[in-house]
Amino acid sequence: MKKHSIRLIALMFLACCLTSAVGQKRNKYEFERNLPVYADSLLKDLTYPLAWGHSPIKSFKKWKKVARQKVFDCMLAPPPAPLPKPYEVKVLCEEQREGYKARKLEIRLSRYYWVPAYVLIPDGKGPFPAVNALHDHGGHLFIGKEKMIRPLACEDSTVIKDADEWLAGYEGQFFGDYLARHGYVVFSADAPMWGERGQKEGAQRNKYDMIAGNMMMYGIDLSAYMTYDDLSGTEYLASMSEVDASRVACVGWSMGGYRAWMLSALSDRIKVGASVCWMVTTDEQMSFKYSRTENGGFANCFPG
């Protein structure tokens, strides 16, 4: 009798848990599959009045100035500039590689935080052209800059192993190291939530949207902070004595491709931008045909 009672209690507890997990339903509702039921109407109302070709501004130079300011307005408040001086840098370690030097840095891009980064500098006499290499999302937050540049020997063995495993999907080629061997200074920094800018509790992709929402409560935007850091990182790169500031480019794929086109649009430092495999449209991504199902959508979302 006692066994049956315990079993019955366990089954009732399981039933309650399943009910909570599935969620109670009402006959009427307003949201479906992570979207409001009127999502298609919202898409029809998006006319993009400031888009080039739609805008009444016909001078590209004037349009660029107005459109750029609109983007900055949507990005909300920037991180406060560092004090007492910009681009305070700590060199954490350095090593010689075949044809170039590799350094791990921490750069003071804001009064709030330091940003970990790698920089590769070709041997020989500069100044050299430079590339800001912007890492992807990939659903993998444990590494960031290490997706673009081979980790230095001073890194933890788990980081080196993880980067090598990630590289298997790219035919074993670290893109940044390839560029450095061909005469480019290469810079790559961790975006917020990636690599050494992640969570104390460990990389948890399913927490991304929650953290982004919490940051909005402070009047700031997580995706915008990523873009602000890319802008500041590019300014630091252009300020290096080894760099020809008139020949600075950026490149990235997936989320890095998004970062590349934002950086190209917002910085006059960038002379060439390459956005690789960044090809979704709002009409597809935010419709019932596709619908967002993964975490991390805030990585490319400004409030405006």
Can you describe what each PLM-predicted range is?
Residues 252-262:
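Glycine-rich nucleophile elbow surrounding the catalytic serine of serine-hydrolase chemistry
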Residues 1-27:
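Bacterial Sec-dependent N-terminal signal peptides
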Residues 24-73, 77:
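N-terminal pre-domain segments of enzymes
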Residues 73, 77-126, 130:
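N-terminal cap/lid segment of alpha/beta-hydrolase-fold proteins
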Residues 242-254:
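Alpha/beta-hydrolase fold nucleophile elbow
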Residues 126, 133-228, 239, 286-287:
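Cap/lid segment of the alpha/beta-hydrolase catalytic domain
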Residues 210, 216-217, 232, 272-304:
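Mobile cap/lid helix-loop segments that gate and shape the active-site cleft of serine hydrolases
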